[in-house]
Structure formats: C-alpha cells, structure tokens
Amino acid sequence: MIVTVFRSRLNPGAQDEYGPMAKHMSDLVRAIPGYISHKGFIADDGEKVTIVEFESEEALREWRVHPEHAKAKKRGIDSFFSEYKFQICSVVRHREWTARTGPGVSE
C-alpha cells in the first residue's frame, strides 16, 4: 500500500474557488484503479491535511499524471496555496482492530 500525505495552506480568500475544485478532484480520484480511500482534515492552525491510500505506486502514478489532476496542481501552485508539501510513503506494517459491540451483532 502507498499512502500520500498532502499538507497545505490556502492563500487568503482562496477557499471559495478552491472548494469546488477540491470536491471535483475527490470525485475523480475514486475512479483511479487501485485507489483505496482518502480523508481530509483541517488542523487548528488552518493547515489542510489530506491522506490518500493507493494499492500500488502504479495507481498513484495514474493519479499523478491524470490530465485534470495535473491542471488542478498547477492552479493550486499559481492561485490557491501559500505553501504545500507532500509525502509518499510505503506501508511497512498495517494492523487493524475493531471492538465488538456485544453478543448477537453480526459483522
């Protein structure tokens, strides 16, 4: 599994235009073969953090070179972001645990 962590800060006044574009990118990435999931958060200090999971580096590459995503990245640099950084990580170990809610509950 490949995890990307995208951290950014928007320029003042950019949210109104950025929001619809970000929503469109969110819809597009779901169609990439090998896409697993993504979630976004806004920290108390205003930093936006998006975590995206892909099955492979090839799936990530497909997203990276997607024509609409490429245009959105350029627009982000030119208009929306005061700063950004991203990290691409290979998952070394993965564990999950879910508490059972009680007897008689099916999973």
Residue spans of the language-model regions?
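Short S/T/G/P-rich N-terminal loop/turn motif that feeds into the first structured element of a domain
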Residues: 1-48, 55-65, 81-107
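Short acidic (Asp/Glu) patches
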Residues: 72
